[in-house]
A protein has these predicted regions:
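Active-site beta-loop-alpha junctions enriched in small/polar residues
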Residues: 12-14, 40-44, 87-89
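Glycine-rich, proline-tolerant flexible connector loops at the mouths of alpha/beta enzymes
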Residues: 35-65
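N-terminal small/glycine-rich loop or linker at the start of catalytic domains
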Residues: 1-16, 50-51
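Conserved, mostly hydrophobic/aromatic
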Residues: 10, 29, 95
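Glycine-enriched alpha-helix->loop->beta-strand junction motifs that scaffold or abut catalytic
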Residues: 33, 96-99
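Catalytic beta/alpha-barrel core
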Residues: 58-63, 80-88, 99
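Hydrophobic faces of well-ordered beta-strands that scaffold small-molecule active sites
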Residues: 7-11, 35-39, 82-85
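Glycine-rich anion/phosphate-binding loops
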Residues: 14-28, 65-66
Length: 99
C-alpha cells in the first residue's frame, strides 16, 4: 500500500508581522496546490527577554488573533490543513484557538 505524501507550504515567519503579506503568502500557498500551510506563531516573550538585542524584532513579527483566525479560515475554506510551529504556552493556546 502506498502512503500519500503530504506537501506543506512553509511560510514560517515570512509574513514579517504584516497582515497584507501574510494574506498574500497564504493566497500563494493555497494556489500552489499544497496539502497544508505552515506558519511560525512568534511571540517575543516566548523567545527572549526584553533586554535581548533582537527582542523588538520578535515583537514586530507578532500578529493579532483576528488576523490568524481570518488566515486559517481562508486555508480551511480551500480544503487545506494549517500547521504551526509554537514556542511556548501562549502560542500553543493561540494555535488551538485559531487553527
Amino acid at each position: 500500500m502506498r502512503k500519500k505524501i503530504e506537501i506543506i507550504a512553509e511560510v514560517a515567519q515570512g509574513y514579517e508581522g504584516n497582515e497584507k503579506l501574510a494574506n498574500l503568502l497564504t493566497k500563494g500557498a493555497i494556489a500552489s496546490n499544497t496539502d497544508a500551510v505552515k506558519f511560525q506563531l512568534v511571540y517575543a516573550d516566548e523567545l527572549a527577554t526584553p533586554d535581548y538585542e533582537y527582542y523588538q524584532l520578535f515583537k514586530e513579527l507578532e500578529m493579532m488573533p483576528r488576523i490568524w483566525i481570518d488566515i486559517c479560515q481562508k486555508i480551511h475554506d480551500a480544503g487545506k490543513k494549517v500547521y504551526f510551529d509554537v514556542f511556548g504556552l501562549f502560542s500553543l493556546d493561540m494555535a488551538k484557538q485559531v487553527g
